[in-house]
């Protein structure tokens, strides 16, 4: 079954200078349990697309369906509940700098209404999974970039999501740290059967971790398919840049 289905999604922004069409009739199907890459140059529309997947950005037109349920038809309370099933990690980690590592991971569970003891127990389990159990009482300023991203991953898993969206999650990291984060994401995918969507401009990330990929240019998807097929037999000019 399709975990995520994007149907003819367009997104237009208006400004004093005029309108900008960030997405143009994008359609995409991502199956349950796979690691799916979306790649393109800066300004291709990748981040806008991933933000439409959890309705942080509402499409100007088109539909976003999660397990067959259209997000556009949900009331605000239903949408908040649906978003609990969609974790997200970012390039710059977005951690609460005045809170400890443990409290950062607890934060989304507090928002859910979980009791402190329950939240802390789960946060400790998640920190063990991401290899940071000994850093529970540290603060983000005391961590390396890779460690910060591991905290962000643990926090994203706190609500037991079915989907994890990764927006340029490794682009601020060195190659060795990137490799360790990708291995962690693969482990999480296997352990929890979470569908992972990776937004990146790094071909090495797609080759390392993704089974399928969509290539974007100027707000459109120009090519989709399995990673092996796409890069063995590229059809688009954009794809040729990556092979």
Question: Which residue ranges define each predicted feature?
Answer:
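Helix-to-loop junction immediately C-terminal to a conserved catalytic motif
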Residues: 54
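Conserved ABC ATPase signature
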Residues: 139-143, 147
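A short, proline-enriched helix->beta-strand linker immediately N-terminal to the Walker B motif
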Residues: 158-162
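Helix N-cap at the start of a conserved alpha-helix in ABC-type nucleotide-binding domains
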Residues: 175-177
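ABC ATPase "signature
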Residues: 224-225
């Amino acid at each position: 079954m399709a975990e995520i289905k994007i149907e003819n999604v367009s997104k237009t922004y208006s400004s004093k200078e005029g309108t900008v069409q960030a997405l143009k009739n994008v359609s995409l199907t991502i199956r349950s349990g796979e690691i799916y890459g979306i790649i393109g140059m800066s300004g291709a529309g990748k981040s806008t697309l991933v933000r439409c997947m959890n309705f942080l950005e509402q499409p100007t037109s088109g539909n976003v369906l999660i397990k067959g349920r259209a997000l556009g038809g949900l009331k605000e309370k239903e949408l908040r509940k649906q978003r609990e099933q969609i974790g997200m990690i970012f390039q710059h980690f977005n951690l609460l700098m005045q809170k400890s590592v443990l409290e950062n991971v607890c934060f989304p569970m507090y928002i859910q209404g979980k009791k402190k003891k329950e939240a802390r127990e789960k946060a400790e389990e998640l920190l063990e999974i991401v290899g940071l159990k000994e850093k529970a009482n540290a603060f983000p300023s005391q961590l390396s970039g890779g460690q910060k991203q591991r905290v962000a991953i643990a926090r994203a898993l706190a609500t037991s999501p079915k989907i994890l969206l990764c927006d340029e999650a490794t682009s601020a990291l060195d190659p060795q740290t990137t490799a360790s984060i990708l291995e962690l994401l693969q482990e999480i995918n296997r352990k929890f059967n979470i569908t992972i969507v990776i937004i990146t401009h790094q071909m090495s990330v797609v080759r390392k971790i993704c089974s399928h990929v969509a290539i974007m240019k100027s707000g459109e998807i120009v090519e989709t398919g399995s990673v092996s097929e796409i890069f063995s037999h590229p059809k688009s000019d954009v794809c040729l840049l990556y092979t």
